[in-house]
Amino acid sequence: MKTKSKLNVKFTFKPFSKKQLQVLFWWQSPQYKDKFAIIADGSVRAGKTVIMSFSYVRWAMMNFDGVNFGMAGKTIGSLRRNVIRDLKRMLISEHYHVKDNQSENMLTVSKNGKTNYFFLFGGTNEASQDLVQGITLGGFFFDEVALMPESFVAQATSRLSVEGSKAWFNCNPDSPYHWFKLQWIDQLAKKNAIRIHFLMKDNPSLSEETLKRYDSMYSGVFYLRYILGQWAMADGLVYDNFDREKMVVDIPKETVWEKQWISIDYGTQNATVFKLWSLSKGTWYNNAEYYYSGRETGRQKTDEQYIDDLEDFFFDHNLSRRDVKLIVDPSAASFKKALRNRGFVVVNANNNVLDGVRFMMTQMNLGKMKWTEASQYTLKEFGSYMWDKKAADRGEDAVVKEHDHCLDADRYFAMKVLYVKKQRNIKLRKEGI
């Protein structure tokens, strides 16, 4: 049984904003103490999560003893990473005793002669509701509730049968037709809930420089949601931040490439594309492109024929199989096997569409990804790759699976090369809220 109770990094509290103080004391306020739920939604990095989780445990410890409580994230891993690590530091700094039973995903928290138990859950999919069946709880904290299925949240809130129990919701905005927006935020009176809407300026730990940096990172629907904190619909062009004047460049002939990758979107009926990405002075350039559509030409190619074309692509651009790796859609099993049989180094792409679109838009805005006139099919797709309006009307974010082959390959590249590098540079934050 694996347990931990000590952390080496002490949490330093900074002065709270007005909204953070509301979250911290709402359950003691004569105006709100009888409310069943609190909802803290709004922009990213607004100081919602840390104050919500701390207030939740503080409320539980001041009002209950020997009671079970629930805490959930999209996954248990994300909950531990985004909430529990800092929460334990905060609690220990405030003289709570915390024992983390990692094998059972349970925190045992004690102070002033009281002990309560906080069970950790992942609200990943429809089957997740089975995880909370049968347990009686005094409260439930949902981190990023907009990423969870309605069935899980409904089952979890139905377990709150202890007298005085409350639900705590925290999230960034999604579609205005998202189930949580319709069922909770739009029905505060019916749900007997209080809502506190956050913006980044409500986080006192963020400097003006940091605020400006985040403001420049997002575009389109993600800017409306993550910066302005609006429940906005995904419609129109997916990459509406694409600026041809800034993002399509001529590359000097004497440019020396520091590193190169090829990203591949493979299709049998649909198009197959190879995208050459080359690094120079901190920016990646798509300086060559292969595009073939059997549907458009009326003649399909076999895996071996595509690999023949890839060998020609390597020869034409003076590429080495030893140095230039291929990023390929993980679903293209037979094609990947054939590539490896011919001596190519293949790595699986990350095919999370929404995360990939959001991250690639950020890299475009930061000037980390640029294209050339050689990317002719990609440039066409930037003007025709659309959000799915029918899905948006259902409260879902989805793209229309048309005019997306080159941009899918670009997304694979961004998530495999740029995102991994970004994750490696993350350091443990030692500042406060």
Where are the language model's segments positioned?
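Pre-P-loop entry segment of helicase/translocase ATPase cores
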Residues: M1-A37
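Catalytic acidic motif of RecA-like/P-loop NTPases
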Residues: G77, A146-L147
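Short beta-strand scaffold segments in enzyme catalytic cores
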Residues: A271-W277, R411
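ATPase catalytic-site recognition across NTP-hydrolyzing enzymes
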Residues: N203-Y266
